[in-house]
Each structure stands twice: as structure tokens, then as C-alpha cells.
């Protein structure tokens, strides 16, 4: 039977309306962005204020044996991060190379770390592999206790990504490189996960006298600033100083003095400032890509339709 011209026109109109329907948001989501901090350093609690001020969230991957130790988060700080909208992830108990362990030990690391965090009143659904290392045996056990697990890989994630092999980029103190990676993720409508460890400021020190002590207060003159020393043996070798700003803004040329050690030196140049870089990154995302959602791992999995 031949179709009438009116029927053909109606069918074409119907097909055109179907073709113009929006794509399924689960299979073609807008770009997503997740920022993570590995190991549970106490600086997570400090930098969380910058995220809160800009209406953003992040994730902290906590190694439970380190909770409450020097330079690491306390139980109260971990709960505070969760209350601020951050997601807390397990990073095992002792931070081992999981693929080198036998199955019973892997199971113990993954199960007990989650139980210990939950005993603090923290909701835990995902894991971060120490050193970004896993294998089939590790993945199999991770599936028993977690919704997902993150490694490295320097590539983007999509709805097709294996949730127990989430990929990520390590932040290398290069804000320009990070912005270029954000640009690529947005263009590809991908999920970009970025991680780093401790947050601090690194500067060169000239005419150093004595050795600064980790944990001591540093005084900067004439700027009048104060900071918490995060010195290490490597800092001494390379002639640098790492610190956590407390008040003011230290400037090049300041005389730096340790309150306890009385060590001193002249502040040369700023090598990197993680706090300024994170603030700049969040402003860049908000201004350039307002529709690129800043999410936790759990939220990203939900938006991609990953169970």
C-alpha cells in the first residue's frame, strides 16, 4: 500500500522531533572534576576552608594507622571534613604495596581500614590504592568491601571505566599544566580526577644558619607573617624550606627565624605555593567552565550511572 503525502510528512516530522531530543544524561554527562588528597595529612583540614569558601568539595584518602600522628589528621578533623561535604576514602591501614601481599593480608588491609574509619563515625564507600598499585587479586578483594577504587594512569574516566581501576592525574606543582588538563577534560566531556599529598609552600633559603625543626613556628620579618615549619631532611639537602602559612603573606627578602631552633635565613624565591594554586584552580573552573561539576568520587559514580 502506498503512503499518502500527508502521512509521509507526518512521519518525517515525528522522526525529526525524536532526533532533536536531548541525549541521555547518564551516557553523555557534562565534564566532571574531582580533587583528592592522599595519605590523610593534617593540611587537608586547612585547605578545606578554601574549598568551602568557593562552594566546592574534595576527597581525603586516609591511611588509618597514621590517624592522629604528627602531620596527619585527627579523628575529629576527619569527621569535620565529612561534615563539610568532603568524601573520606580508605587508603588502607599501613600503606603497603598491595600486589606484593598474600590474599589474607590484602583482605585485612582493606577490610580493617574501612571498619576503623566507620568506627569514627565516617561513611566510607571507596578505596585509593597505595602507590596507585593493584592487580587482579587486589581488585577482586576490593570489590567485596568498596564501591570503587582509584589508581593512577594519567588519563580520564568515563561511564565505561572499570570502577575498580579509576584513573587519575598527580598534581605536579604546575598550575598551567593542570589548567590545560582541565581544558582537555571539558572538551572531551570526561571525568578528571586529580590528586596530591601534603599541601604546603616551598621557598629557597639563602644564608641559612642552623636547622629548622619540623612543627616549630616560623617568624618572617619585616612582613610580620607566621608559618608552621614542615622541614625535612630533603629540604636541608636542596636548600629549601617547606611551611604551612598561618598569618600574613611571607615575602621575598624576609628574614625567617625558627622560634624554637633559632635557625634563620633569608627567604629567596617561592618555588611553589599549593594554597594559591588550589585557589586559582577553583576560580578557573568556576569562571571558565561553570557547568563542569566539582564532585566527590561517590557523586561522580552516581552521575555516570556506575553502580
Kindly label every feature range from the protein language model.
Residues 200-270:
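Autoprocessing Asn-cyclization modules and mimics
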Residues 1-9:
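Bacterial N-terminal signal peptides that target proteins for export
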Residues 24-28, 53, 61, 68, ...:
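C-terminal domain-boundary segment and adjacent tail
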Residues 24-46:
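Boundary/entry segment of secreted carbohydrate-active catalytic domains
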Residues 8-17:
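Bacterial N-terminal signal peptides
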Residues 19-22:
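Sec/Tat signal peptide C-region and signal peptidase I cleavage site
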Residues 172-183:
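A Trp-anchored, charged/polar loop motif used as the substrate-binding/catalytic surface
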